[in-house]
Amino acid sequence: MGVCESSNDQNKNAGNNIYDSTNQYHADNTNRSQRKRNSLVLNNDVIISDIHKNPETTYEKVKKLGTGAYGEVWLLRHKLTGKEYAMKIIEKSPYSDEKHIINEINILKTLDHPNILKILEFHISQNKIYIITDYCPEGELFDEIIKKKIFTEDEASFIIYQILQAVRYCHDMGIIHRDIKPENIMISHRENNGLLHVKLIDFGTSKLFSKGDKHKTFVGSSYYIPPEVIKKQYGEECDVWSVGVVMYILLCGKPPFNGEDDDDIFHAISIGKYDTSSEVFQKLSNNAKDLLNKLLMYNQSERITAKDALSHPWFNTEEFQTLYRTHTLNKNSVKIMMNNLEYYKSNNIIKCAALAYLVHQNMNNMECIKASNLFIDIDLNKDGKLEKNELISAYMKYSDLDINQATKKADAVFLNIDTDFNGFIEREEFIRACINPNIFTSPNNLLSAFNFFDLDGDGKISVDEVVSKFFQSSKNKNEESKLLLKKMFEQIDVNGDGFISFEEFSSMIKGIISS
């Protein structure tokens, strides 16, 4: 994660001084490695944090979206920006599973994928837990299934491909979801042709795992659990089975394993044979039947992985790829974004964090969506993050460079964009590097970002508040990091009074993007 600071006297003709000159990237590898060792880390622990106050001071409740066993879900509107979000409010009690709720927060903070619900911020008070996330106005996939009954293969493949991408990403991150079902798949928006964009939600029962781990806790929802969960000896393959159940329901209009009660359902799952004789099933394409067979493979060790499922022939057709690419990449826009990547720089981490917060709060902005679409296009293996070879391919494709030129650019860009130093470029890292942040500098957006740092709400930012923000990442908790932050703070505190005023903060943001 991270956002760049401009050079004052170079690249004036770009009209966006947030980017540094290409000379930055001709420094030798030793200097780059040294820069990484001496840099602060900007990751989601910094950007997504406990706001230490009742969210109703920042957001207004619009309407109640639902009520569950332990709390409520509300539609919110940001008082400054007017943007809409969802908020889950959980009452702390002996009956609410606080451990699972904290687990969900911690896992969501690590995830950055277009098909996974994004957490924006949270607050843990004495009596309640508040979680603020994206708002998906179209509701649950479950409700769509009730209305529609049966989906066409085009409609179903579009949904299943997205879910598999989310599952593959989670598994790569060492996370098992353990409760994939239509109620935990939200519809974010619809295409004009009716195709649904979806996001996976509810990570309360998810769990970190290592390859080969076997888990014994009985977790999940009756229709969607695989045989090995019933036997209490399962791994990440359980998620793939659940995706298979969702796929069967979409295509056939009923669960593959049914019964009068849970015992009947578990018995049917334990046998593992689903109905293939119905007229609806018989009309499915051979590719659809084959993928269902692989997803619902009884033996978990023989079950297809989410990664391999994404390459299945059901998705690997020209018709599907045309269907899935609902966005069109404008050649000129792509050229500008790829060019912006080259000038990306992050030498004042406080400025980076301010702009990172603005982007995180504005991911539904059209420019962010364009950049996200480019990210998806560059992500050739669909694992939700960019590797260096994918960036090299992108430069060869979009900038007409040979492999040596593309490698040189990718090497330099990669080091500057990967400011959490995990060896990959995540979606938001990429987006922040290739868009013009000028789109986020309305007075209300600036005040929202200012308030992100102004923890006590006194109208000024202290160095201790900045340190507190960055120390939320354990990787920054050291004296060297504190000294670096103080030096960067002094660069922004123009009048030297020991605080950053809103005027100084606004000048910082506007100054680094002015031509």
Task: Label each region the model flagged.
Residues 355-356, 387-401, 426-437, 462-475, ...:
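Amphipathic regulatory helices of Ca2+-sensor modules
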Residues 159-160:
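Activation segment signature within eukaryotic-like protein kinase domains
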Residues 121-122:
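A short, aromatic-enriched beta-strand patch in the conserved N-lobe beta-sheet
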Residues 72:
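Conserved N-lobe ATP-binding subsite of Hanks-type protein kinase domains
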Residues 127-140, 144:
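Conserved short submotifs of the Hanks-type protein kinase catalytic core
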Residues 89-111:
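Conserved N-lobe beta3->alphaC-helix segment of eukaryotic protein kinase catalytic domains
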